[in-house]
């Protein structure tokens, strides 16, 4: 039974709304007058990810993973009290994650040895650089999902025990990091990875 697995591939994380805020001016009687409002979101983006897995049992694998992508941070400004046209400001955010998780191969009754469905869950550290790398936001991420692996070649070939492809879909939850509402945000994510087993 192969014990180690190394994979590298493409990752996509969907957009995440970051909330809305209204800028106001305090008036003399203690009230407030609206100046403008902002609506922010982190756009969906593609990137790369890599992982190393250690098989604990026939069905259970412990994984370490890392990813990098560059989503656009968009801030839309509208409702200016002087009637100025709405405008959207954008900047590129460099997003890094490093963490771990557990993968569980689901029983398939031995119907297809090359095809193996699984469930996966994990989490880790989130780091985001923006404003040309001068500002740093950190947080945590958590994810849960599932997918399948497909063995393209099995048995020993050039010191390996198998080569295959993996596809998965996940719910990606981000806590803190780049955000203007102080809350957590969830978006869909998907990955396609080539892997080698040893």
Language model features by range: what are they?
Residues 3, 43-48, 95-99, 139-143, ...:
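Transmembrane beta-barrel architecture of outer-membrane proteins
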